[in-house]
Structure formats: C-alpha cells, structure tokens
Amino acid sequence: YELPEGFHYEFYKPGDEEEWVMIHIESGEFTSIEKGLKHFHDFYDSFIEELPNRCVFIVTDATGEKIGTATISLLKEPEYGYDGAVDWVAIKKRYQGRHLSKPLISKFMEIANNVGHSKLILHTQTTTWLAGKLYLDYGFEILNKEEKLGWSILKTLTNHSKLSEYDKVSQEEILDSRNVEIER
C-alpha cells in the first residue's frame, strides 16, 4: 500500500523526540510532553543509535508536520521466539480515517526486512481495537491466546474470523469500571 497524495515518510533524526511525543499525545496515548519523553527514553535509549533505521514518521507534504509513526524495536529479551517487535504505532486523531494505516503497516514491514527481521511480534490493546482488527486483516496471528478477555472484547467489537475460538462479551465486560469511573 502506498501513502495517499500529500504525505511522505521520513526516518527519525535526533531531535524528533518531541514530535514523536506529540503524535502520541494527539492520538490519546500520553497526557503530557514530560510523560511522553520519559516513555520515549525508557523505551528507546537502549537502541537509540539504531532508531534512524527503525523509527519512521508519516509527514504532510504541505506543512512538514509529523502526523504518524511506527518503530521496529529490538527486544531486550525474545518474546515467543521473536527478537523484533512493532511498537508505538500511532496516527494523530485528526488524520485518522485518511487511509494512512495500511501504508504505515506496509512501511514498517519493509523496514523490518531491511533491518533483518523476517518475523515480528506486534503488541496491541483493546483501546485501539480498530488497529487490532487491521493487524489481523493484514495477516498477523494471535500468539498470546491465554489473554481471553482481550481477544473476546476484540471479537465483540469486530467479529473478526480469526477470533472464532473466542466468545463475545457483554458491554459491561468491555467497559471496565476502572476506566469509566468519574469522581466528583
């Protein structure tokens, strides 16, 4: 898949940290630049010298704004036999729905091949269930089958054929009270 007209890719360069954080703030992952920068350094500092070959941005042609990102990470310890992972995939909310996700997935798969990973693990979560569906559509397989509630939530929301072994759950099970509790 190719990026739509008006967008291009750029690889990470030292100094792009705050733009990476802003993508994640505007996609709902972080609430502050400080928290985002802490996550960035906690996660990437162990392979920061390789980041210019592993972290990519989607950039608008018109303004040069970085609006999406994904990284092929080096895992400190292998997971399920994989040493590389797709991490920190995000697109700013105002750019979601513009057919950028499939090109970004294609790009991170290309990057993985270029840096020597023939297989990847990908982490996702139920709060980004549309992304989870897209990853399954793209051919990713479920490895952590024991995470039954998460996969059942995804089945309820998407009815994806790869989730046939999981039962659907109720709305109450999807809306964990810890996530929707409001204090006065």
Locations of regions flagged by a protein language model:
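A conserved beta-strand-loop-helix scaffold within acyl/acetyltransferase catalytic domains
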Residues: 25-91
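Conserved GNAT acetyl-CoA-binding A-motif
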Residues: 112-124
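Hydrophobic adenine-recognition pocket in adenosine-nucleotide-binding enzymes
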Residues: 12, 89-91, 124
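Conserved acetyl-CoA-binding loop of GNAT-fold acetyltransferases
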Residues: 135-145
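Conserved beta-strand-loop-alpha-helix junction that forms the acyl-donor binding cleft
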Residues: 122-131, 148-158
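A short beta-loop-alpha structural element at the N-terminal edge
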Residues: 8-20
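Acidic/histidine-enriched, glycine/proline-rich intrinsically disordered or flexible terminal extensions
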Residues: 153-184
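Conserved acetyl-CoA-binding loop-helix of GNAT-fold acetyltransferases
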Residues: 88-91, 97-114, 133-137
